[in-house]
Structures are given as structure tokens and as C-alpha cells.
Design a protein with these regions (language model features):
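Structural signature of multi-pass alpha-helical membrane transport proteins
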Residues: 2-101, 159, 163-267, 327-336
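C-terminal-most transmembrane helix of multi-pass membrane proteins
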Residues: 293-336
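Hydrophobic transmembrane alpha-helices that form the pore/transport pathway of multi-pass ion
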Residues: 96-133, 261
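Helix-loop junctions at the membrane interface of multi-pass solute transporters
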Residues: 73-74, 124-135, 260-263, 290-297, ...
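Generic hydrophobic alpha-helical scaffold/packing signal
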Residues: 246, 259, 277-279, 292, ...
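The feature identifies polytopic integral membrane transport proteins across all domains of life
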Residues: 78-85, 105-118, 134-144, 172, ...
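Juxtamembrane membrane-interface segments at transmembrane alpha-helix termini
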Residues: 60-61, 123-130, 153-155, 250-256, ...
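Membrane-embedded alpha-helical segments of transport systems
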Residues: 87-95, 118-124, 139-159, 178-184, ...
Length: 336
């Protein structure tokens, strides 16, 4: 007979395994906050200057996992994609603006709140969708679509909503998105097409390697952006964290319930609702951080994206763990 202590320890270990990435993200943020000088510069190189290359590597890895089928899938799931894009590029940027105003942020900090709401879906969303028993194929398609739209929509949203806080060079931002996101993804797609047989033959290994690279890149970005913005974070305190939590929660709730509402006549179910919720709630914080550094040259503007990334990766892991456990129960209920 198994002892209660063993059962408790097993539950704790299982929980830690499920939340491993979220815990790693929190640990990186706490470490950089506690020892900022250790993560500002290595060997004369400012770590913040390596954020853009890190995001480019992540985007290249994402490109190697995509195919033409991911885009063609839009025709099969138009309503789900439409709901996701609507929330991603209209509701989330506007909520970033309202939160910045509501919490009394100004200048680069306020612009950063709008920026994190104006970027595409996060690269970690596909992994979270898998763990949450959502529609992974739809998740990949939505991430792909929002990313391809971002060079045009993100600069426009920033110009309209963040222009009252700081001067926004929309053209420079468009070029930066093309350089940081679109070019690496395209290059990754070309490599995948040229080496398709090799990728298909070793898919499991490639997926594990790419996931590790992506997660490592995200953790590095958090370290590199938390250290130089520590003082601003300490000054903003609870307000900037509260704004990130509210923004993320609104993304999850609006994505889930609007999809359920549209699903009444568009044949969208629980899996689609979970997918849209994850895609909308999990913004590409790394991309927002790279734009803050590359276009605005500001660690302060990158702070909201950094806090959002830390929180969303933790909340996403918790949400995926809960949904993953309840998927079977909900399915049985529907079948009855």
C-alpha cells in the first residue's frame, strides 16, 4: 500500500514537471532582479543588444516547423482565425492603451503596454495548446497568420494608440518586424522545404531541439531585459504587474467566450475556444521586447513586454495543466 507521504510527494513532483517552463521563467526574472549587474554586460557586450538576435533565432526555428498547409488551413477554419485576429489586433492593443491610461503610466512605459498588446501571438502558445488538449493545428495556423500580418498592423496600432505617449516611427517599426520576424521565418521555411525528408524522418528529435532552443531564448530574453529595467520595475511596483495580469486575463477570457458565442452558428467547439483563448492571451512578448530595444532603444518600453512574458508563461502553464486534466471529463459530459 502506498504511503500518503509518497502520494503527496508524487503530486508535487508531477505539478513541478507540468509547470517546469513557467517556474524557469520566474526563476530567471527573480535572478536578474536580485543580481542585475550580472546580466547587464558579459565580456564588454550588453546582453540587451543580443535580444534581437535571440528572437531571430527563435523565429527561424518557428519557420522550420511551418508549411504551406498551415496557411491553407485558414480556408477550413475561417471563423476561428477571424475571431483570433480580431481580438489580437483590435481588442488587445486597445486594452493595452486603456490599462496604460488607467494605471497612470506615461512615456515609454505606457507605449510598452500598447506594444505588448499590438504584437502577434506568442511562439510558446503552440506548446501550451498541445498541453491544454486544444487544437494544435489551428494554433499553429493562427500564430502564422498573426505573425504575417504584424508588419502592417503592429506599426499602425502603435502609431494610433501609442503616438500620444511617445513618437512612433511606423516605417522603422515595419522594417524591424520584417528583419526580426518575417525574414527569419521565411529562411526557416526555405530550409524546411529543402530538407523536408530529413525533418520528417527525425521530426520528434527536431521538435525537442527546437522547443529547447525557443524556451532557452525566451529565458535569455527575460534575463537580458529584466536586469537593465530593474529600477523602473521597482518604481512601478505592483501597478505594472497588475496591468500585465489583467491584460493577459482579458485575452484568455475574451478569446474563449467570444469563440463560444460565435461557435453557436459557426460550429466551433471547446477545442477551438481553448485555442483562441491561448493565442490571444499569450502575446509574443519576445517580439515586443525586440521592437522596444530595436526601434525605441528603450529597456523601459520593453518592461511591460517582459513582465507580460513572465506572467503569461506561468499562467499559460497553469491553464494548460488544468484544461489538460479536464479535457476527458468535458468530453464524457458532451457525449452523454
Amino acid at each position: 500500500m502506498q504511503a500518503k507521504g509518497d502520494t503527496a510527494i508524487g503530486c508535487v513532483l508531477a505539478f513541478l514537471r507540468r509547470q517546469a517552463f513557467g517556474i524557469a521563467v520566474l526563476a530567471c526574472a527573480a535572478t536578474a532582479f536580485a543580481f542585475p549587474s550580472a546580466f547587464k554586460e558579459w565580456g564588454g557586450v550588453k546582453l540587451m543588444s543580443l535580444v534581437v538576435p535571440a528572437i531571430q533565432i527563435i523565429m527561424f526555428g518557428m519557420g522550420t516547423t511551418l508549411s504551406a498547409a498551415d496557411l491553407l488551413r485558414v480556408g477550413k477554419r475561417p471563423w476561428a482565425v477571424a475571431v483570433g485576429v480580431f481580438l489580437q489586433f483590435l481588442v488587445m492593443p486597445f486594452m493595452g492603451f486603456l490599462l496604460a491610461k488607467g494605471f497612470g503610466f506615461s512615456g515609454e512605459l505606457a507605449a510598452g503596454c500598447v506594444l505588448v498588446g499590438s504584437v502577434a501571438g506568442g511562439t510558446a502558445s503552440n506548446v501550451i495548446a498541445f498541453l491544454a488538449k486544444a487544437d494544435v493545428a489551428l494554433s499553429v495556423t493562427m500564430t502564422c497568420c498573426s505573425t504575417l500580418l504584424s508588419p502592417f498592423v503592429t506599426p499602425f496600432a502603435m502609431k494610433v494608440l501609442a503616438g500620444c505617449f511617445v513618437e512612433i516611427d511606423a516605417m522603422k517599426m515595419m522594417v524591424e518586424i520584417l528583419k526580426v520576424v518575417i525574414v527569419p521565418i521565411t529562411a526557416g521555411g526555405i530550409v524546411h522545404a529543402l530538407l523536408k525528408k530529413q525533418f520528417d524522418a527525425h521530426k520528434a528529435v527536431c521538435d525537442r531541439i527546437l522547443s529547447f532552443i525557443s524556451m532557452t531564448g525566451i529565458c535569455f530574453t527575460i534575463l537580458a531585459l529584466t536586469a537593465p529595467s530593474r529600477d523602473t520595475f521597482a518604481a512601478a511596483g505592483v501597478a505594472i504587474v497588475a496591468a500585465a495580469v489583467i491584460h493577459n486575463t482579458i485575452g484568455y477570457l475574451s478569446g474563449y467566450w467570444l469563440t463560444r458565442l460565435v461557435g453557436r452558428f459557426a460550429r466551433l467547439g471547446e477545442a477551438e475556444a481553448r485555442t483562441v483563448a491561448i493565442e490571444v492571451g499569450m502575446q509574443n512578448g519576445g517580439m515586443a521586447g525586440a521592437l522596444a530595444v530595436g526601434v525605441m532603444n528603450s529597456a523601459v518600453a520593453a518592461l511591460p513586454a517582459n513582465i507580460f512574458s513572465i506572467w503569461m508563461n506561468f499562467s499559460g502553464s497553469v491553464l494548460a495543466s488544468w484544461w489538460g486534466r479536464t479535457a476527458g471529463v468535458r468530453k464524457k459530459t458532451v457525449e452523454r
